[in-house]
């Protein structure tokens, strides 16, 4: 037991951008209570269409803004006494029965980006402002691309463990039934926040013969945000975009989006979505029952995993192994 407790180091939450909702889920004037990063939060869309995220509890008497709160212009109104809080700054903008607003009347307002079909929040353990950005995916909503298919799942895992899978080609043989370990290479971008994995496409599905010379290109930004594209399919393409968000240290909410060029979506789209959901279900028992080895015993074939561990350290405010 002592060894297990020592090795099962509790990883803190990494800093970065994480999805807190699908864009399509939040209409104008909607107010939704959400729980991420170990925090009670409130997500709402202002009358001008901006998605906002603030801490949940009113500084007045502690009412939860997400249960009965209403959008008033660019603010969210507390259901208890009607105090209104600006979604961008968090400052109290109005008290209906008092002209003077106390200086401490504010809630924390989180930095939010809305792109690629999702609403993202910036998390930082020290509440520092965003330190890096991530790109728009032109495929999502593109004229030649299909309406995205989506899938999501809440899992008992740490976000780093789920992301580490991308750097573990060997597990595809033993967990997913691949006949071989796909050859792959990793390129780390010079800014340090992004890396790319290029691997041969190994498939046993009915469309394997069409993809035998193609490659999978995985781009990642921070811990938990990934875009997987196909390369080498003449005149066609696929994109799988995903964000895995910490709910607590050992509980995550993963969202996946799949889109394909319209000329192949009927042939490939449904099969890829089935493959995605099947793959996650195969990984789930491992993630559910594994511990985090802070100092794993690597063999010489674990080069990608060792490189990933070193790269991932930069996203934590406190030292991690």
Enumerate the language-model features and the residues they cover.
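Rieske [2Fe-2S] iron-sulfur-binding domain
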Residues: 2-6, 19-140, 239
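A general structural signal for short secondary-structure junctions and capping/turn motifs
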Residues: 9-10, 33, 111-113, 244-245, ...
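Basic/polar N-terminal segments that are highly enriched at the extreme N-terminus
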Residues: 1-11, 321
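Non-catalytic accessory segments flanking enzyme active sites
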Residues: 7, 13-14, 175-177
């Amino acid at each position: 037991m002592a060894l297990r407790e020592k090795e099962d180091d509790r990883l803190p939450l990494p800093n970065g951008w994480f999805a807190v909702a699908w864009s399509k889920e939040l209409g104008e004037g909607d107010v939704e209570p959400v729980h991420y990063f170990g925090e009670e939060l409130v997500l709402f869309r202002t009358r001008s269409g901006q998605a906002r995220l603030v801490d949940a509890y009113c500084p007045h008497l502690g009412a939860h803004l997400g249960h009965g709160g209403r959008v008033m212009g660019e603010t969210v109104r507390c259901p208890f006494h009607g105090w209104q809080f600006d979604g961008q700054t968090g400052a109290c903008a109005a008290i209906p029965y008092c002209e003077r607003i106390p200086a401490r009347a504010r809630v924390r307002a989180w930095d939010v980006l809305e792109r690629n079909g999702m609403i993202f929040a910036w998390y930082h353990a020290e509440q520092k402002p965003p330190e890096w950005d991530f790109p728009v995916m032109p495929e999502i909503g593109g004229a030649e691309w299909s309406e995205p298919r989506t899938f999501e799942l809440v899992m008992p895992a740490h976000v780093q463990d789920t992301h580490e899978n991308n750097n573990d080609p060997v597990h595809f043989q033993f967990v997913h039934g691949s006949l071989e370990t796909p050859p792959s290479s990793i390129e780390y971008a010079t800014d340090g926040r992004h890396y790319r994995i290029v691997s041969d496409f190994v498939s046993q599905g009915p469309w394997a013969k069409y993809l035998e010379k193609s490659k999978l290109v995985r781009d990642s930004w921070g811990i938990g945000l990934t875009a997987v594209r196909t390369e080498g399919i003449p005149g066609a393409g696929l994109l799988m975009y995903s964000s895995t968000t910490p709910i607590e240290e050992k509980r995550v909410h993963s969202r996946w989006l799949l889109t394909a060029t319209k000329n192949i979506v009927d042939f490939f789209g449904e099969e890829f979505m089935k493959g995605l959901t099947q793959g996650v279900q195969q990984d789930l028992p491992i993630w559910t029952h594994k511990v985090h080895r802070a100092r794993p015993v690597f063999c010489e074939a674990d080069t990608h995993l060792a490189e990933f561990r070193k790269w991932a350290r930069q996203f934590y405010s406190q030292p991690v192994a």
